[in-house]
């Protein structure tokens, strides 16, 4: 496993989470429950939007893609974490490590772009309500989703190819629970300046600019709803925006703090906790915040259940 270049390294070792042995089973059960909640919650959203014609709108098109992204985002890291906790085998093959990094970047970036699309959809719905249908046409919505997939695929592939050209020498221990890009760069024994510059530049395009666009959209929304005379309408709009912004702040806050503004004395434990927030907690909370508390989603669930009961009663 030791060697002078990347071809001699057959695998990496994931240190995982700093958990005491006596807490291992409890943490395993907790993460398994959180992962299953994420899967079931996001799958429920996707199925309901697919089955109920009332939800075939731009907002729920973006939401179904966001749920798919959350589902895949968690599936990139959590199953491997659970496997390592159960088998006590921290190794991950070199190719699998780069593959995990690729899909981690892909679905993480995809969520960033979809959050922008959702913010824009709500901006148009509130600020240009009379022209909403004309502006948010099916072609525009599909184009926004397709563009999100294309850009994130390119970005993830770029970082993966740049990582694959690096040399890894003696140290193959990753102090994380997944193949984190910044952790891999610290293990490289070749020049990583190109990688670091690409992370800084592309990070601004992929993370910071979408975050600013979301803030700009909601600033316009707040400005618009303050002019609405109905206090009920204002409360409803603020409630919707508040839920969305809470998840946006959680996701972008940890990502920006971890990758774009790292502190010189940041500990591995702190980085791991921050990573757990946006890889495990946020995808689990999204179904509850975005949909399961939504009246349209509850109505769709009721209609689907009623249709099933009617079908089986025939």
From Swiss-Prot:
It comes from the Eukaryota. One of its GO terms (biological process) is signal transduction. Glycans are attached at residue 5. Its main location: membrane. It is found in: Cell membrane. InterPro entries: GPCR_Rhodpsn (IPR000276), GPCR_Rhodpsn_7TM (IPR017452), Olfact_rcpt (IPR000725). One of its GO terms (molecular function) is G protein-coupled receptor activity. Residues 1-25, 80-100, 159-195, 260-272 are extracellular. The chain crosses the membrane at residues 26-49, 58-79, 101-120, 140-158, 196-219, 237-259, 273-292. The keyword Disulfide bond applies. Residues 50-57, 121-139, 220-236, 293-314 are cytoplasmic. One of its GO terms (cellular component) is plasma membrane. Pfam families: 7tm_4. Keywords: Cell membrane, Disulfide bond, G-protein coupled receptor, Glycoprotein, Membrane, Olfaction, Receptor, Sensory transduction, Transducer, Transmembrane, Transmembrane helix. Disulfide bonds join 97-189. It is a multi-pass membrane protein. Belongs to the G-protein coupled receptor 1 family. Odorant receptor. This is Olfactory receptor 1E1. It comes from Gorilla gorilla gorilla. The gene is OR1E1.
């Amino acid at each position: 496993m030791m060697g002078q270049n990347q071809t001699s390294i057959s695998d990496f070792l994931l240190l995982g989470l700093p958990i005491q042995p006596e807490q291992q089973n409890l943490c395993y059960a907790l993460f398994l429950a959180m992962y299953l909640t994420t899967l079931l919650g996001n799958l429920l959203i996707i199925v309901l939007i697919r089955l109920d014609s009332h939800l075939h709108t731009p907002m729920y098109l973006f939401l179904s893609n966001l749920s798919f992204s959350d589902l895949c985002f968690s599936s990139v890291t959590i199953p491997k974490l659970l496997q390592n906790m159960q088998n006590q085998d921290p190794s991950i093959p070199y190719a699998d490590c780069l593959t995990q990094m690729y899909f981690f970047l892909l679905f993480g970036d995809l969520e960033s772009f979809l959050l922008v699309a959702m913010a824009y959809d709500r901006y148009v719905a509130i600020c240009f309500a009379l022209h909403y249908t004309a502006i948010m046409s099916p072609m525009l919505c599909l184009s926004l989703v397709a563009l999100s997939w294309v850009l994130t695929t390119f970005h993830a592939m770029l970082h993966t190819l740049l990582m694959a050209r690096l040399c890894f020498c003696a140290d193959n221990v990753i102090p994380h629970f997944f193949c984190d890009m910044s952790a891999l760069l610290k293990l490289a024994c070749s020049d990583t300046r190109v990688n670091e510059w690409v992370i800084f530049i592309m990070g601004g395009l992929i993370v910071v600019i979408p975050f600013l666009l979301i803030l700009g959209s909601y600033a316009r929304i707040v400005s618009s709803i303050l002019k609405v005379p109905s206090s009920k309408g204002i409360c409803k709009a603020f409630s919707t925006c508040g839920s969305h912004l809470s998840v946006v702040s959680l996701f972008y806050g940890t990502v920006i703090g971890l990758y774009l503004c790292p502190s010189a004395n940041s500990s591995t434990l702190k980085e791991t906790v921050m990573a757990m927030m946006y890889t495990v907690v946020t995808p689990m909370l999204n179904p509850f915040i975005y949909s399961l508390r939504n009246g349209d989603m509850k109505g769709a669930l009721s209609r689907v259940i009623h249709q099933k009961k009617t079908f089986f009663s025939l």
